[in-house]
């Protein structure tokens, strides 16, 4: 049996069941485990309760239960500078950003690794559902987890070899159900704790509009069909995303009782374009352009400048077949779907896969239906 006692693993602990079981498993495997709670946002609510304080108490309880030291580190400044300002800037451009992808790249696997190194870490570990595989040349590859319904490679798609070489994902071979059972069997106080949802700085109560309006002034404007008919008033373009159905306040017409969906935005005119029907032609793109490309591995040497793979355009979506074509300088990518893709959203990540391997990702800029650019921003 391998003696892991001289290998220090610093675990990012959130106070949730996944990261708690991560620490537990590593402790059981004999590693020298240290727990660290990352405070990324001052999330005191209207009642003066800071959920981070409650979560830290849970970290302390779990760490004490399994017998490991624990610390708290404050990354509020790093988070503001590297993640939150990006989030707001994207909304100013009329886009819909995904802060989790950037947070993992900049905070959980950058600032956190730098801090863990100060604690003498050989590795860091998190409660993400993802797997790693090292090839014969020694390069690390990012792979999907066993529990495909919980797989989080989408959010880890901007990590690089240096980060992955330093990381352990102990939950790779477990389902969520099994993780909860492990927590119960060990008597962990968080065994039945609800999973956190939503963006950390908005919290679970989902007061998104209220929150965003503190940083960006909302400007009402017209809701129009693509042929210019005014059908309503929007509360501010930043509050809507492509393909959105809820919250439009529009009913059916005599001619058409289909529900309304957001099909586009014009940020210069402050117009929100809406259309009826889930299958509305204006919601479908044949191809898209994306930038801020990041490859986990050297994709060009493996596949060339043009290749076929699968992709996700949002986290919960099934993989879709796509053809990827890189620009000559490698800074832009054109992604052509095998079948037209619905509700492609600028600001979101398009994440590429070869089977179970996550190849990397890019940030969507524009979407097209044949030669016609969709009115997405």
From Swiss-Prot:
Signal peptide bounds: none
UniProt entry keywords in alphabetical sequence: ATP-binding, Cytoplasm, Disulfide bond, Nucleotide-binding, RNA-binding, Transferase, tRNA processing, tRNA-binding
Catalytic residues of the enzyme: 103 (nucleophile), 200 (cysteine persulfide intermediate)
EC identifiers of the protein: 2.8.1.13
Location of region: Interaction with tRNA: 150-152, 314-315
Primary site of residence: cytoplasm
Swiss-Prot/TrEMBL GO biological process terms: tRNA wobble position uridine thiolation
Subcellular compartments: Cytoplasm
Keyword RNA-binding applies: yes
Site (Interaction with tRNA): 128, 348
GO molecular function: ATP binding; tRNA binding; tRNA-uridine 2-sulfurtransferase activity
Catalytic activity: S-sulfanyl-L-cysteinyl-[protein] + uridine(34) in tRNA + AH2 + ATP = 2-thiouridine(34) in tRNA + L-cysteinyl-[protein] + A + AMP + diphosphate + H(+)
Binding, ATP: 12-19, 38, 127
Region of interest (Interaction with target base in tRNA), ranges: 98-100
Disulphide bonds in the chain: 103-200
Purpose: Catalyzes the 2-thiolation of uridine at the wobble position (U34) of tRNA, leading to the formation of s(2)U34.
Family statement drawn from the similarity comment of this UniProt entry: Belongs to the MnmA/TRMU family.
Name of this protein: tRNA-specific 2-thiouridylase MnmA
């Amino acid at each position: 049996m391998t003696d892991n006692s001289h290998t220090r693993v610093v675990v990012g602990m959130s106070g949730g069941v996944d990261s708690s079981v991560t620490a537990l498993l590593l402790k059981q495997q004999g590693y020298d485990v240290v727990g660290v709670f990352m405070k990324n946002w001052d999330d005191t609510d209207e009642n003066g309760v800071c959920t981070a304080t409650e979560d830290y108490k849970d970290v302390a309880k779990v760490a004490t239960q399994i017998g490991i030291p624990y610390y708290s580190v404050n990354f509020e400044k790093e988070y503001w500078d590297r993640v939150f300002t990006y989030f707001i800037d994207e909304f100013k451009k009329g886009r819909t950003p995904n802060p989790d992808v950037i947070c993992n790249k900049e905070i959980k696997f950058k600032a956190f690794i730098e801090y863990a190194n100060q604690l003498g870490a050989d590795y860091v570990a998190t409660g993400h559902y993802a797997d790693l595989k090292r090839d014969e040349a020694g390069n690390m590859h990012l792979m999907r987890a066993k529990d495909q319904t919980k797989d989080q490679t989408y959010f880890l798609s901007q990590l690089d070899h240096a980060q992955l070489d330093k990381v352990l994902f102990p939950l790779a071979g477990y389902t969520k159900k099994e993780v909860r059972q492990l927590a119960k069997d060990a008597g962990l106080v968080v065994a039945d704790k609800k999973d956190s949802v939503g963006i950390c700085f908005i919290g679970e109560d989902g007061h998104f509009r209220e929150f965003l309006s503190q940083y960006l002034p909302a400007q009402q404007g017209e809701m129009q069909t693509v042929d210019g008919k005014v059908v309503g008033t929007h509360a501010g373009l930043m509050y809507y995303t492509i393909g959105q159905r809820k919250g439009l306040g529009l009913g059916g017409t005599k001619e058409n009782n289909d529900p309304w969906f957001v099909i586009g935005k014009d940020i210069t005119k402050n117009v929100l374009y809406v259309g009826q029907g889930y299958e509305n032609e204006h919601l479908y793109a044949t191809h898209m352009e994306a930038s801020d490309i990041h490859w986990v591995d050297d994709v060009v040497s493996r596949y060339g400048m043009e290749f076929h793979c699968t992709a996700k355009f949002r986290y919960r979506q099934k993989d879709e077949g796509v053809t990827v074509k890189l620009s000559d300088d490698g800074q832009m990518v054109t992604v052509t779907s095998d079948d037209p893709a619905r509700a492609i959203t600028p600001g979101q990540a398009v994440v590429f896969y070869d089977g179970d391997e996550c190849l990397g990702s890019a940030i969507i800029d524009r979407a097209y239906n044949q030669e016609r650019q969709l009115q997405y921003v």
